[in-house]
């Protein structure tokens, strides 16, 4: 018997391995830089230069890029140092192969840059590398059966979430920022932060729409010695699109966005004065788009007057439990460690770290930390620019009712981000931190079921056929369907409906039916 089959595509996680890299290195202050009095602020990011699979080992090579803002000795001057530390880590793996999509995510768990003496700094970092191997696979399932011998079949509806689009791409943002008229010309950029805020990316027909803001903060030195330290903040909106030929606006997105390159440089304006900032960033995007389908799957087959041999096999499909885009508004207080008198808050910067995610009956219970840096000006002539760091815990429940089975067997992914962050001085050495944290979650459930793989129709033994009753009077039992009754007595559904004058398929318990045997066996 011929079966019409359709293909179901899914992405299956084959292996995930977590490794930690410890970096500890002394850095010499370049000769062109002033002696270091004390570190004000530092930041770092990782660039993975190479990921290569070699048998049962995954080699990851990259660099930790860091920047330091510091107070110089014997002056009120602020200066900066930039550098990088190379690293290479070999991760032992078991199930990864070259055919898999291998993704390595990084996170800076801890970063500490301390002063050894005025010409040397110590840089310590703890990186977590998470290597995940994904396998794209397809499952064939039977939709219908065709044989021309009067076979009867019944189908069921299967809801599946199929992987429709998987791609990696980059989105480049280039803007020029003009200084306001009350700002002096730029001599040297000492510090900058360029962070994405409130990025939204959604699928459309044939493309991906992306929009959001880049939050720019820049400290610079003016061209004249008597000019005090200058800083500015700007929100740079952007919008655009990326080509994705197979995308449709009904698809369910799972998109990870991370800056992989950031730069802010001073440049001349049309009058030849250093009054512009050339801002550039590159966003790396890992895109997975899912399509929810309701498939009609062949569930059972029989043939009146014949023996039917069914061969089945297990098939695993993904089902979307929930997708949720949440925003958590948090307000907390941050205490200063010393009795600084704050004259002005310059800038607040932060990152979100997810510490634990636990599926519950009510949804995903998320515990995390908002790591905050607040740069401010203190009433201290020797070191006016200072920074306070804090770690603010939060807990949030992503509403998504989960069954006991889903809690144990579901796979979930949560992408966190920061949409808004602000700091306000309360007095008494306290700052009020307000933030809007974005939590985009997707919960999938893998369902394994037996599906019909092949059907063979065999002629019934004539003696067996002759022993079947010619006419049967049957009383409908609870849970009976026309299909079950017809299969039990080797009859056809249409014949039962015609003989009993039934207009539909609905039956009532206690209802009486007359079932007539097929006139001849299958041959």
Language model: regions and residue ranges:
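Membrane-lipid interaction segments
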Residues: 1-468
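Extracellular LysM carbohydrate-binding repeats and other cell-envelope/extracellular binding modules
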Residues: 473, 491-523
């Amino acid at each position: 018997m011929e079966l019409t089959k359709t293909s179901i595509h899914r992405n299956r996680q084959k292996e995930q391995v977590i490794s930690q890299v410890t970096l500890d290195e002394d850095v010499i202050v370049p000769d062109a830089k002033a002696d270091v009095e004390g570190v004000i602020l530092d930041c770092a990011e990782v660039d993975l230069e190479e990921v290569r699979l070699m048998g049962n080992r995954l080699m990851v090579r990259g660099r930790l890029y860091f920047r330091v803002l510091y107070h110089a000795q014997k002056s009120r001057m602020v200066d900066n140092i930039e550098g990088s530390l190379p690293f290479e880590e070999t991760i032992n793996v078991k199930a990864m192969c070259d055919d898999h999509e291998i993704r390595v995510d990084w996170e800076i768990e801890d970063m500490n840059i301390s002063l050894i003496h005025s010409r040397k700094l110590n840089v310590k970092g703890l990186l977590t590398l998470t290597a995940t191997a994904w396998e794209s696979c397809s499952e064939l399932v039977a939709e219908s059966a065709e044989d021309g011998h009067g076979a009867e079949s019944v189908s069921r509806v299967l809801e599946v979430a199929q992987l429709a689009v998987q791609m990696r791409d980059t989105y480049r943002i280039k803007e020029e920022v003009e200084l306001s008229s009350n700002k002096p010309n730029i001599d040297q950029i000492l510090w900058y932060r360029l962070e994405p805020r409130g990025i939204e990316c959604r699928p459309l027909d044939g493309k991906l729409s992306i929009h959001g803001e880049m939050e720019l903060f820049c400290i610079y030195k003016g061209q004249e010695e008597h000019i005090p330290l200058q800083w500015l903040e700007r929100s740079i909106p952007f919008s655009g699109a990326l080509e994705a030929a197979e995308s449709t606006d009904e698809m369910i997105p799972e998109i990870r966005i991370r800056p992989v390159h950031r730069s802010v440089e001073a440049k001349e304006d049309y009058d030849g004065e250093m009054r512009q900032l050339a801002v550039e960033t590159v966003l790396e995007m890992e895109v997975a788009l899912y399509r929810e389908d309701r498939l009609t799957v062949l569930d059972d087959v029989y043939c009146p007057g014949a023996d039917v041999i069914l061969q089945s096999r297990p098939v695993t499909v993904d089902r979307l439990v929930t997708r949720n885009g949440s925003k958590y508004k948090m307000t907390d207080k941050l205490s200063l460690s010393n009795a600084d008198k704050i004259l002005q808050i310059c800038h607040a910067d932060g990152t979100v770290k997810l510490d634990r995610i636990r599926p519950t009956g009510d949804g995903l219970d998320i515990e995390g930390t908002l790591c905050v840096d607040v740069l401010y000006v203190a009433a201290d002539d020797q070191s006016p620019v200072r920074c306070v760091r804090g770690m603010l815990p939060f807990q949030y429940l992503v509403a998504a009712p989960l069954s006991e089975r889903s809690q144990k067997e579901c796979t979930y992914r949560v992408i966190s981000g920061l949409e808004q962050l602000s700091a306000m001085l309360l007095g008494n050495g306290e700052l009020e931190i307000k933030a809007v944290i974005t939590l985009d979650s997707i919960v999938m459930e893998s369902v394994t079921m037996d599906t019909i793989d092949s059907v063979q129709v065999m002629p019934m033994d004539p003696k067996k056929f002759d022993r079947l009753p010619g006419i049967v009077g049957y009383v409908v039992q609870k849970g009976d369907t026309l299909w079950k009754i017809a299969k039990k007595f080797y009859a056809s559904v249409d014949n039962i409906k015609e003989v009993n004058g039934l207009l539909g398929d609905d039956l009532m318990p206690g209802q009486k039916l007359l079932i007539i045997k097929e006139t001849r066996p299958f041959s």
